[in-house]
């Protein structure tokens, strides 16, 4: 049983809490849900693709993943595949200011007002993979390969920011009037506005893959 728990924790990623519902996604199209975080139920996703990000907004769950995969669900139980218009690997999705935004490889950025119809946007960073995404204080922030940080007030027009690092940034979040991003070699950067970033001492040289707050 110990080995089984280890496997699940590795394969099933991205578990945000939405009210009384948990939704977790991962390898081979796996989606599981729980009302209390204790008892979990496997759902039928209709795909075998790796699923990476999951978010909730405007009454809809949205998950993204390999080969341009986007799935939506009103309740976390029944899922519908949507047309993304890309075959790129998608690596993060969030909801803010009435808009869903997903990001991925080669600077891919897609937006949708309803989670169903998606539009590709110009990131200006096509040579780099994007891996993390958040929304806070009226700003979308995405991070990725080679220290890439992009910001947008509307999800449509994006501006590249100076991170001061070339490491792969893996995750980003916003809370308490600050953005925080983490990545390889124990990298942690913080910013009050998404524009100016400061390196912080993490105390580890191991890769950091995710960050959150309450």
Question: Where do the protein language model's features map onto the residues?
Answer:
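Cleavable N-terminal signal peptides
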Residues: 6-7, 17-18
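Short, linear, compositionally biased motifs with a strong N-terminal bias
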Residues: 10-11
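Residue-level hotspots at or immediately adjacent to binding/recognition sites across diverse folds
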Residues: 19-214
């Amino acid at each position: 049983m110990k080995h089984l728990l280890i496997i699940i924790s590795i394969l099933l990623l991205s578990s945000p809490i939405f009210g009384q519902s948990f939704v977790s996604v991962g390898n081979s199209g796996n989606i599981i849900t729980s009302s209390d975080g204790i008892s979990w139920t496997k759902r039928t996703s209709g795909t075998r693709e790796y699923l990476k990000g999951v978010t909730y907004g405007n009454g809809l769950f949205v998950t993204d993943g390999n080969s341009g995969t986007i799935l939506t669900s009103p309740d976390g139980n029944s899922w519908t595949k949507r047309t993304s218009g890309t075959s790129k690997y998608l690596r993060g999705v969030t909801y803010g200011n009435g808009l869903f935004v997903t990001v991925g490889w080669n600077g891919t950025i897609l937006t949708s007002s309803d989670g169903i119809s998606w539009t590709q946007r110009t990131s200006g960073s096509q040579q780099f993979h994007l891996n993390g995404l958040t929304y806070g204080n009226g700003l979308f922030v995405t991070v990725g390969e080679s220290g890439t940080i992009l910001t947008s007030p509307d999800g449509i027009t994006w501006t590249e920011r100076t991170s001061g690092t070339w490491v792969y940034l893996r995750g980003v979040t916003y809370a308490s009037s600050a953005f925080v991003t983490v990545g390889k070699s124990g990298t942690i950067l913080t910013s009050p506005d998404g524009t100016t970033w400061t390196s912080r001492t993490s105390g580890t040289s191991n890769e950091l893959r995710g960050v959150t707050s309450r």
